[in-house]
Amino acid sequence: DITRNHLSIVLIDLALNIIDNTRLRIPFHESHDYFCILKQEFEKIVSKNIPDRSKLLGVGIALPVIIGEDHKTVTYATVIPLSLNIYNFFSDYIHEPFLFFNDANSAGLAESWKGDYKDAVAYLSLSSSIGGAYMNNKMIYGGSNNRGGEFGHMTIIPHGKRCYCGRYGCLDAYCTANVLTDFTEGNLKEF
């Protein structure tokens, strides 16, 4: 999971049990230095836990962006700046098969799979941006252009605060973790 300020690497088995994980505070930059750190941390976890590399089935990379149908293209990114050829950039550092996933869809799907949800489920992600996912029968509903769960950009206050997306009154402009901590002197747990 790559965010504006953190890199998280989680190794799971096919039953979705967490085998190992790490989280680093490191601002995202589409640079050689950043991707060297990503590769180093990825290699640490894999080599420690999977002696037989052929047992690693693949890598999912969660990003706070809109992902194309092929899971290899980024169609819209404002939370973190990414170039359109980012898949090629990643492939210089990650040599196992990998695909991109929207961060909220990825988290929502994991919750859906781990839970005993058989009907429609909505997942809301509150972090440095607001995200969300709709699932039905443990499958993501992407909607038009894979924006089905983009709760953060629903207008809650017409003509309200300007959002980073360029529109006004979006939920994201009012309810991100960063905004909410302004009410509690930086301590989100107090909110």
Language-model segments: what does each one mean?
Residues 1, 58-64, 123-129, 133:
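Short beta-strand segments
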Residues 1-32, 70:
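HTH-adjacent hinge/linker in prokaryotic transcriptional regulators
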Residues 18, 73-74, 140-141:
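Hydrophobic "anchor" residues
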